[in-house]
Design a protein with these regions (language model features):
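Non-catalytic structural scaffold of enzyme domains
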Residues: 2-284
């Protein structure tokens, strides 16, 4: 079902991975690196397997059936790697696939929407959410926020251009600023006091967004809060790693060289990247 090829480097260091079960983290691309950085910060002893489904990027324009199929294939692969827990470092898959796949796998699977919603209601009463088209259409954040705190107001904006611009490393492109202005304008008009990054890619745009928003608007990064929830789950299940972690393993379904180049900017080092073909990940 799966085959792989290696892009530069020696993966012998991963041979002991099964003796030290890892946390699996996946996203459509580099967005989930915001979650990975939080794991490094909050859970420095944990070994991690990161999967970027770059062959199917971006998820935000995909149908629910496509997302569900891709997520199942990724989780099957992670199951073969004997992970102890998985974080869906992707709001779109969290919104459209989490509840389905939680019933299908025997390891804990955490999504980013609920931790983000919980954090948002602690920050303000007029909450804006910027998200991919699929996440915005799902109303996942609005529903989660309203269930927690019914008296808040929520506005969502679909931002289809953000993920491609981030994946192309065009953060500081003047065009990106113009796009961001157009997405934020309706939220600023509503006088939001809180903005939720409804996509794990979006914290990469923090300098751009912060410069465009009123200073009183608080930014909520769900990656911070899903990793805090992960820490609680590890403690609850008594499965925290207390030894030194294994090197982070990176795998992608698309071009490993491109991901490695992006990783240098977001991680501060060039990761060794493995290409994995999820051959069953097709939807007719």
């Amino acid at each position: 079902m799966y085959s792989s090829s290696i892009f530069e480097g020696n993966f012998d260091d991963f041979s002991d991975q099964n003796s030290q079960p890892a946390i699996g983290v996946f996203d459509s691309g580099v967005g989930g690196l915001t979650v990975l950085r939080q794991i490094y910060k909050q859970l420095p002893n944990e070994s991690i397997i990161y999967f970027g489904d770059t062959a199917h990027l971006p998820y935000g324009i995909r149908s629910q059936a496509e997302i569900l199929q891709y997520v199942r294939e990724i989780l099957k692969w992670m199951q073969q790697q004997r992970v102890k827990m998985v974080i869906m470092a992707c709001n779109t898959s969290s919104a459209l696939a989490l509840e389905n796949v939680r019933q299908e796998f025997d390891f804990p699977i955490l999504g980013v929407v609920l931790p983000g919603a919980r954090a948002a209601v602690q920050q303000g009463k007029r909450i804006g959410v910027i998200a991919t088209p699929a996440t915005a259409k799902s109303n996942a954040y609005r529903q989660a926020i309203m269930e927690i705190q019914p008296d808040v107001e929520v506005w969502q904006v679909s931002c289809p251009e953000f993920v491609p611009l981030i994946e192309q490393n065009r953060i500081h492109d003047p065009y990106t600023t113009e796009v961001a202005k157009s997405y934020l304008e309706p939220l600023i008009k509503q006088e939001i006091d809180t903005l939720v990054y409804g996509c794990t890619h979006y914290p990469h745009l923090a300098p751009v967004l912060r410069a465009l928003l009123p200073s009183y608007v608080k930014l909520v990064d769900p990656s911070v809060h899903v990793v805090a929830a992960c820490a609680q789950e590890l403690d609850l299940l008594s499965i925290r790693n207390t030894r030194l972690p294994m090197p982070t393993r990176f795998a992608v379904s698309g071009c490993p060289q491109q991901f490695a180049q992006s990783g240098l900017q977001w991680l501060g080092y060039t990761p060794l990247v493995e290409q994995v073909y999820l051959t069953d990940a097709t939807v007719s």
